[in-house]
Amino acid sequence: MKLFFTTAMALSMGLMVMGQSQRLVLAEGFSNASCGTCASQNPNYNTLTAANSYPNNPAKLVAIKYQTNWPGTDPMNAQNPTDIASRVSYYSVSGVPWGALDGTAYAGSSYSGALANLNQTTINNRYAVTSPFDLMVQHSINPSMDSVTITVNINCTDTLQLGSGVVKLHVALTEKTITFSTAPGSNGETSFKGVVRKMYPNGNGTT
C-alpha cells in the first residue's frame, strides 16, 4: 500500500493582528469511526475541504482530522491517542463531529462546531484575511518509511507585540486517505481523509 503524507502546520496566537502575507486557512475536524453523525456530516465536509485544498488553485486551506477514542472503536486513534487527546483537551471537545477554522468553532445553523456549518463563504472570508507570517515547510521521508525530517522556516511579515509563550508552532503529519476493506468502526465509513498520524514534538506544539 502506498501512503501519501502531508505536513500541516499552524501558528496559534493570543493576539489578532493584520499582516502582509497570504493566509492558508487551517480546518480542524474531530471525528470517530463509530459515530453515526460523523458518517452523515463527513461526506459533504470532505468534498468542500478537498475543493479548497492542494492541488486546486488557489489552495485556500489545509484540512486535518483528529480521530477520537469515543463514542466507540477507532483504530486510527489507537495508533496515536496522546496527541489527539491533547487537541481534544485544548478545544474542550465534548462531542463529535466537531471542528474549527483557524481555531474558531464552525458557526452556522447547526450546533457550534458542527462540520455541517462550514461553507464556501466562510472559507473565502477567512482566506481574505492576511497573515502576519510566511511559513515554509520542507520534509523528507526516509526510504524505509519509518521516519521523517521536517524543517520549518518562519518569517514575520508584520510587526507583532507578543510576549513569551503567546505564539506556538504546531506541526502535524497527516495521511491523505486511509481506506479499509471493511468499516473499522460501527458507522459504516471505510474511507478517512487527512487523518493526523503524529504531531511534532507533540500535540502541545512548540513555543
Regions found by a protein language model. Name each.
Residues 11, 19, 27, 55, ...:
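A generic structural signal for short, solvent-exposed coil/turn residues
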